[in-house]
Amino acid sequence: MSHIRSRFSKPADELVVRYTTSLPFDWRLYKEDIKCSTAHARMLSKQGIISAEDSQSIINGLNTILTEIETGSFVFKPETEDIHMAIEGRLFELIGEAAGRLHTARSRNDQVATDVHLFVKNACDETINKIRTLQGALLEQAEAHPQTALPGYTHMQIAQPVLLPHHLLAYFEMLERDCGRFTDARKRADVMPLGSGALAGVPYPLDREMVAKELGFSAISQNSLDAVSERDFILEYLSDAAICQMHLSRLSEEMVIWSSAEYAFVELDDAYTTGSSIMPQKKNPDVAELCRGKTGRVYGSLNTMLTVMKGLPLSYNRDLQEDKEPLFDCVDTLGDSLEVFAGMIKTAKFKPERMLRALEKGYVLATDIADYLVGKGESFRNSHGIVARLVSYAVAQNKTFGELSLAEYRQFSNLFEKDIYAVDIKSALNARNLPGGTAPKQIAQAIARAKKILAEAGVKN
C-alpha cells in the first residue's frame, strides 16, 4: 500500500486506482518534475534542512531516473498515482531512506503547480518559435510575388484589387499579434509556486528566491492559497492558442478555396495533399482541412479548462488534475498545425495568371471609377449611384468596363472623358499608397518591416 494511504485501513478499489491515476498523461512532466526536485534538494541542503550528503544522493538519483526515462528503461508502474510518485518510488529503490527527505517542506500541490508553470513557459517559447517559422514562409512567398495582383473579397464577392503579398502579410500581422499574446502569457507563467506547501506555506526557512533563480523563474508567488489553486496561466495559453488556431483556420479555408479547380489560385505541393480511395484524379487539401477541423479541438481544450475552474473554492481540489490533458493536447495540436502549415505555405505554387484572369471579372474597378468621378468634382454618394447603374448596364450588355465606349460611359455622366481608360488594375493599386495600403511602395515597406521583425526575433529569412 502506498504511504499516502497510511491513514486508511484498506487499499483503494482497483477501479478507483484506474479512475484517479494521472500517470498515463502527466508522465510528460518528468523533466520539469526532476528539475524542480533537484533545485529543491539543493536548497534544502543549503538551508541546513537536510544534510549535504542526502541532498547529493537525491540529486544523483534524480539524474539516474532522468537518464532511465529518456532511454526508455524506466518502468512506469500502472498502479502509481502520478509522475511525482513514480519518480519518488524509483528514487527510494535507488538510494533508500534518503529519498524520503526530498519531500520535506513540499506538497504535491505546489510541486505540480511548479511543474506546469515550467511546462507552459516552455510551451510559450516553442509556440512562438513555430509561429516565427510560419511567418517566415509567408514572407518568403510575399517577396517572391511583389507584382502579383488578385481580387480582394468582401462577403466572398470580388471587391477591389490587391497585391498577393498584401494578402499574405495580413496573416503575418495576425500571427505577430499571436506572438505578442504568447509573450504576455509567458509572463504569467513565469512565477514560481514552490514553497507554498499544500495551501498555507511551510514552517521551514526555505530560500524560495534561490530555487526560483535555479529554475529560471523571474518571481515567486505572493499568496500560497492562490499559488496552489490558480490555473490562470494555463487558461491564458489555451485562450491564446484558440485565437492562433482560428487564424490558421482562416488561412486553411482560403487554401482550400484557392486550390480548387474553380479558383486555381494556388497549387499545393504533393507532399501536403492526399488522394481519394475511389476517384483517381483527386488532389485533396487534407492538411488545410484538418487544420480547420482541429480548431474545434483547440476551442474544446479552452472550454474544458474554463469549466473545470468555474466552481472551485480555495484552495487545491482534485478537479485540477483535469488541467493537463487539455493543455497537452492543445500544445500538441497547435504546434503540429503551425509546423505543417509552414511547410505547406513554403512549398505552395501561386498562380499569377489565374489571379489576373479573376480580376477581369466582377467589375473590380468599380470603386476606382467612382473615385475618378469624385476627382472630377462629383460627390462620392452621387458617384456611387452612377457607377452602380453603370455596372448594371455593363452586366446586361455582357461587357467589361474596358469594352464600354466613351459614349456608353457618358450615358451615365458627362464627367467621363477619355482618361477613364487610364483607370486600370495598376492605377488602382498605385492609388492606395498610404500606410497599410496595397500599393507596391507600401508593400515594399511592409516586407521590409516584416523582415526586421523576424531579424529582431533571431529568425533567418
Curated annotation (Swiss-Prot):
Taxonomic superkingdom: Bacteria
Annotated keywords: Amino-acid biosynthesis, Arginine biosynthesis, Cytoplasm, Lyase
Keyword presence, Protein biosynthesis: no
Pathway membership, UniProt: Amino-acid biosynthesis; L-arginine biosynthesis; L-arginine from L-ornithine and carbamoyl phosphate: step 3/3
GO cellular component: cytosol
Pfam families: ASL_C2 (PF14698), Lyase_1 (PF00206)
EC numbers for this chain: 4.3.2.1
GO molecular function: argininosuccinate lyase activity
Keyword Cytoplasm attributed: yes
Subcellular location: Cytoplasm
Primary location group: cytoplasm
GO biological process: arginine biosynthetic process via ornithine; L-arginine biosynthetic process
SUPFAM superfamilies xref list: L-aspartase-like
InterPro entries xrefs: Arg_succ_lyase_C (IPR029419), Argininosuccinate_lyase (IPR009049), Fumarase/histidase_N (IPR024083), Fumarate_lyase_CS (IPR020557), Fumarate_lyase_fam (IPR000362), Fumarate_lyase_N (IPR022761), L-Aspartase-like (IPR008948)
PROSITE patterns in alphabetical order: FUMARATE_LYASES (PS00163)
Catalysed transformations (reactions): 2-(N(omega)-L-arginino)succinate = fumarate + L-arginine
Family: Belongs to the lyase 1 family. Argininosuccinate lyase subfamily.
Protein name: Argininosuccinate lyase
Native source organism of the sequence: Dehalococcoides mccartyi (strain CBDB1)
Gene: argH
